[in-house]
Curated annotation (Swiss-Prot):
Protein's UniProt name: Peptide transporter CstA
Family: Belongs to the peptide transporter carbon starvation (CstA) (TC 2.A.114) family.
Entry-linked Pfam families: CstA
Subcellular compartments: Cell membrane
InterPro entries, A to Z: CstA, CstA_N
GO terms of biological process kind: cellular response to nutrient levels; cellular response to starvation; peptide transport; protein transport
Protein encoded by which gene: cstA
Assigned GO CC terms: plasma membrane
Annotated TM spans: 1-21, 55-75, 76-96, 131-151, 160-180, 186-206, 225-245, 251-271, 290-310, 327-347, 388-408, 433-453, 462-482, 494-514, 523-543
Biological function: Involved in peptide utilization.
Keyword match Membrane: yes
Membrane topology designation: Multi-pass membrane protein
Keywords associated with the record: Cell membrane, Membrane, Peptide transport, Protein transport, Transmembrane, Transmembrane helix, Transport
Length: 555
């Protein structure tokens, strides 16, 4: 089997998903109507609610949902074979993941841009709302803590990525000011700034920045120094108006990823490498069973509950008109899925273009690939870029830089979402300080830092990461449940939401229960307790939601 047929099949399905299935959802299920004002136009506070061109907003949404998830997850999951990973990434995206993101986005704009936690309260009561918001808050803190550590680790491992990763920030501020205040030609600016960013990647490859001497002079490890820098940046980035940094940075990053994806796929078409991984491998050494763990290992690229936080947290507050939700919510997810597909191609075929034994070396066991997944992606992707004439070492710098950029984008979007959640909790409990964006951002950063520092070396978030995959997908199931409740309330067809909702809740509840049992058997009472509490919260929210369905008439 070679890579080209897989690429062709996948993109035919993506095209069907966007041009046919998302159109059906938009017109027949949600009945999008551009005459209905969006929250961005109704509120338009110039800070969080800002009507935005759909392609710029797509850039923000795409880069915020992407992060490292669709890279690491598929890179690990192909240990069970390329076929299960391929089917879940492509079919899952078309019929579940894209539906989930689109549903969360539309449901939020129909509720004044409120988060899915607040929307749940309207249907299932205040108690369910508060518990769900607390669950969302805990997941956001975990994402921030883990991504801060992972980005810092990447900066240390790939010092060539430091310069281009930080160069994008001042450039994005200048870009945003030029577009929104000076009204400079958008296309000309885009070409100029992209050229500067790619030159920055070249400079990074020839002038890597090692912060070890500075860190040691401050009595810190390089990783801890970067963690402090990242959270300082996130504090300001999450508090500033979205047009100042968030939108232009994410638009520029999104274009960089789009260009990289195009080059990767051109390289794959030119080289058409042979897939050296087995189609199916049910018993890899040390791996958990493929069912249900495939569905939570690939936690992005096929489906991700974190996307509901982005859709209802930042993107819904910037949507200019309802019809834009198809491009932002659904097409944005197809973009992420295409990245996950590129990772599958890179790790199962690109990795072996110059060494047939490389795949077996990296995928010899579950523990081996869990510690080497990014190596597999960077090396395999660089080989594919080599097919279009890009030197392999420079290709590694490009890929490592973009992994860092998207992880950082996800992190500061997550801090902003955490600020929104804290603000909502402040309104519920009358804590007015939390409704101040700067105060809420400070609390968000401090709580995430507290988790980081709870374990030596900044690894505090990694302690809880084993439960994230299942918890993230449970959140996706609950977000679909909220979309179902909305459609039920307005008397619209619910089957396209109900079927994926039942599937996701069943699969991920089973995985969470198995994780809880395994942790109990290993004597890890902390992770067992966390898993058990999340399962109880899920059952309570589902129970309260269906009680609400029974007692609330449609209108």
């Amino acid at each position: 089997m070679h890579a080209l047929p897989l690429i062709g099949i996948a993109f035919l399905l993506y095209a069907f998903g966007y041009f046919v299935y998302s159109k059906y959802l938009a017109e027949k299920i949600f009945q999008l109507d551009d005459s209905r004002p969006t929250p961005a136009k109704e509120i338009n506070d110039g800070v969080d609610y800002v009507p935005t061109n759909k392609w710029i907003l797509l850039g923000h949404h795409f880069t915020s949902i992407t992060g490292a998830g669709p890279i690491v997850g598929p890179a690990i999951a192909v240990i069970w074979g390329w076929l299960p990973a391929f089917l879940w990434v492509v079919l899952g995206a078309v019929f579940i993941g894209g539906v989930h993101d689109f549903t969360a986005l539309v449901t939020s704009i129909r509720h004044k841009g409120k988060s899915i936690g607040t929307i749940l309260g309207e249907y299932a009561g205040e108690k369910a709302r508060v518990l769900f918001l607390l669950l969302l808050l805990a997941l956001a803190i975990l994402v921030n803590a883990v991504f801060a550590y992972v980005i810092s680790l990447l900066f240390v491992k790939y010092p060539s990525s430091v310069l281009p990763a930080w160069l994008v920030i001042p450039l994005a501020v200048i870009f945003g000011f030029s577009v929104y205040r000076l009204r400079v030609n958008f296309l000309i600016l885009t070409v100029i700034f992209l050229s500067i960013l790619y030159f920055g990647i070249y400079l990074g490859s020839v002038s890597p920045i090692d912060v070890k001497p500075l860190a040691e002079s401050l009595g810190l490890s390089p990783i801890m120094l970067w963690i402090i820098v990242l959270f300082t940046y996130a504090f300001f980035a999450s508090s500033l108006p979205v047009w100042v940094l968030l939108q232009p940075r994410d638009f520029l990053n999104g274009l960089q990823l789009l260009i990289l994806l195009i080059l990767l796929y051109i390289g794959a078409v030119i080289a058409n490498p042979k897939i050296v991984a087995p189609a199916v491998n049910l018993n890899p050494e040390g791996a958990p069973p493929i069912f249900p763990f495939l569905f939570i290992t690939i936690a992005c690229g096929a489906l991700s509950g974190f996307h509901a936080l982005v859709s209802s947290g930042t993107s819904s507050k910037q949507l200019e008109k309802e019809s834009d939700a198809r491009a932002v919510g659904y097409l944005g997810f197809m973009g992420e899925s295409s990245l996950a597909l590129a990772v599958i191609i890179a790790t199962t075929a690109g990795i072996a273009m110059f060494s047939a034994e490389k795949f077996q070396e990296l995928y010899s066991s579950w523990s081996s690939i869990k510690s080497s997944s990014l190596v597999a992606v960077v090396d395999g992707g660089a080989n594919l870029l080599g097919a279009v004439g890009i030197p392999v070492d420079f290709g590694k710098t490009v890929i490592a830089t973009l992994v860092v950029l998207f992880a950082a984008t996800t992190m500061d979007t997550s801090v902003r979402i955490q600020r929104y959640i804290l603000g909502e909790l402040g309104e519920i409990y009358g804590v007015r300080l939390l409704t101040n964006p700067w105060v809420a951002s400070g609390v968000a950063v401090l709580t995430s830092m507290a988790l980081v520092l709870s374990k030596e070396g900044g690894k505090g978030g990694m302690v809880f990461w084993p439960v994230f995959g299942a918890a993230n997908q449970l959140l996706a199931g609950l977000a679909l449940l909220i979309g179902y409740l909305y459609l039920k309330r307005v008397n619209r067809p619910t089957l396209p939401i109900l079927i994926p909702m039942i599937f996701v809740l069943f699969i991920t509840s089973l995985a969470m229960a198995m994780n809880a049992w395994n942790n109990l058997m290993k004597g890890d009472l902390l992770l067992f307790s966390v898993s058990f509490i999340i399962l109880l919260l899920e059952m309570f929210i589902i129970f309260e939601s269906f009680r609400a369905v029974r007692r609330a008439p449609a209108f």
